[in-house]
Amino acid sequence: MSLAVATPASARLSPLTTSSPEPCRRRRLLLSAAAPLRRTRLRRRIAVVASVPDPAARPAEYTPWLIAGLGNPGSKYHGTRHNVGFEMVDRIARDEGITMNTIQSKSLLGIGSIGEVPVLLVKPQSYINYSGEAIGPLAAYYQVPLRHILVMYDEMSLPNGVLRLQRKGGHGRHNGLQNVMECLDSSRELPRLSIGIGSPPGKMDTRAFLLQKFSSEERLQIDTALEQGVDAVRTLVLKGFSGSIERFNLVQKYKFHSV
């Protein structure tokens, strides 16, 4: 989702600029930067663990997840295509009874659990293209293993309302996801939930399309997808990338195909 746009000084805070005003720090720098952070009750409320070489050595149910949705802060972006990642976080929080009421590392956080698995729900409050500057320090501070960081974002290559849950992959030209990957040492080993929003019709400008709200028909498809996404995330957290996730992706792929 690359946007070839110049980035003058006056446009540094645009939600769709392509480059961050400062290069994103690598994971090793994030780890060192996390140390001075104030120890709050928030940190004591989530049981965090470092990555282990053998996933079987520690049951998945005791390993926390960092679940982040990408979007732009502010009421004027609410309900736009580029903010469906935020909507997914809100839907998970609602269905799992998690309150989003903590501010840390340029993010709005919710601490809770899915089943008995501790989860950290994250809505970065930097603009979407700088999401990694919020997610990277949080992952380092709470020592969440990379395989348990789920990023949820809008995807133009998928039809509106179609979801895809993957264990790893590239950034697919999505600038927000690319920034997150850069802040996590450019690793492709990053789970992600892609939320289809379709592509711009005709010659419509990509930026205008992303910052546009859904039509009534598209809104119904997205609302259904969000409910299905909550179920998929719950399955992922409780069972990992099992056969259930494979079946979910297959159903999503053909959900709008006529028989």
Swiss-Prot record:
Sorted alphabetically, which SUPFAM superfamilies does this protein's record hold? Peptidyl-tRNA hydrolase-like
Q: Transit peptide: which range?
A: 1-49
Q: Where in the cell is it found?
A: Plastid, Chloroplast stroma
Q: What GO terms are given for molecular function?
A: peptidyl-tRNA hydrolase activity; tRNA binding
> Do the record's keywords include Plastid?
yes
Location of region: Disordered: 1-21
A Gene Ontology CC term for this entry? chloroplast stroma
Q: Where is this site: Stabilizes the basic form of H active site to accept a proton?
A: D154
> Where along the chain is tRNA bound?
Y77, Y127, N129, N175
Which is a Pfam family this sequence falls into?
A: Pept_tRNA_hydro
Name the keywords, alphabetized. Answer: Chloroplast, mRNA processing, mRNA splicing, Plastid, Ribonucleoprotein, RNA-binding, Transit peptide, tRNA-binding
Name its GO BP terms in alphabetical order: mRNA processing; RNA splicing
User: What are the positions of the active site?
Assistant: H82 (proton acceptor)
Q: How does it assemble?
A: Part of large ribonucleo-protein complexes that include group IIB introns and either CAF1 or CAF2.
**HAMAP family (alphabetical):** Pept_tRNA_hydro_bact
> Tell me, what does this protein do in biology?
Required for the splicing of group IIB introns in chloroplasts.
Q: Give the similarity note.
A: Belongs to the PTH family. CRS2 subfamily.
Q: What is this protein called?
A: Chloroplastic group IIB intron splicing facilitator CRS2, chloroplastic
The source organism is Oryza sativa subsp. japonica (Rice)
